[in-house]
Amino acid sequence: MERNTRKTLQGKVTSARGDKTIIVEVESHRSHALYSKRYRVAKKFAVHDENNIAKVNDIVTIMETRPLSKTKHFRLVAVKQAAMQGEK
């Protein structure tokens, strides 16, 4: 699979405890089939962070890749926005 055709997502880092692994929450909105109300859906992905550069509350871009472990199928592409100091 070529790199430019791989799925890229943007989300917020919720955990950076593991070595070279971060947990990223990706938010999307769906529309209810019958009532057409939009609602929020969030999904968490385990992401490979080779250099341990991402911190909690950073906004990051991730890209789909080959399976790196049982749960990791994404890798970190870039940190879009660093978290503010003191932010929880």
Curated annotation (Swiss-Prot):
Q: Which residues form the signal peptide?
A: none
Q: What keywords are annotated for this sequence in UniProt?
A: Ribonucleoprotein, Ribosomal protein, RNA-binding, rRNA-binding
Q: Which CDD domains match?
A: Ribosomal_uS17
Q: What SUPFAM superfamilies does the database record attribute to this sequence?
A: Nucleic acid-binding proteins
Q: Which GO terms describe its biological process?
A: translation
Instruction: Give any Pfam family that matches.
Output: Ribosomal_S17
**GO terms for CC?**
cytosolic small ribosomal subunit
- Which GO terms label this protein's molecular function in UniProt? rRNA binding; structural constituent of ribosome
TM region(s), chain numbering: none
Entries under Gene3D superfamilies matching the protein:
Nucleic acid-binding proteins
- Keyword Ribonucleoprotein on entry: yes
The job of this chain, per UniProt, is described as:
One of the primary rRNA binding proteins, it binds specifically to the 5'-end of 16S ribosomal RNA.
State the similarity comment: Belongs to the universal ribosomal protein uS17 family.
Q: Return the NCBIfam families for the record.
A: PRK05610.1, uS17_bact
Q: What PANTHER family does the entry give?
A: 40S RIBOSOMAL PROTEIN S11 FAMILY MEMBER, SMALL RIBOSOMAL SUBUNIT PROTEIN US17M
Oligomer and partners: Part of the 30S ribosomal subunit.
- This protein is called Small ribosomal subunit protein uS17
| Organism classification | Bacteria, Bacillati, Mycoplasmatota, Mycoplasmoidales, Metamycoplasmataceae
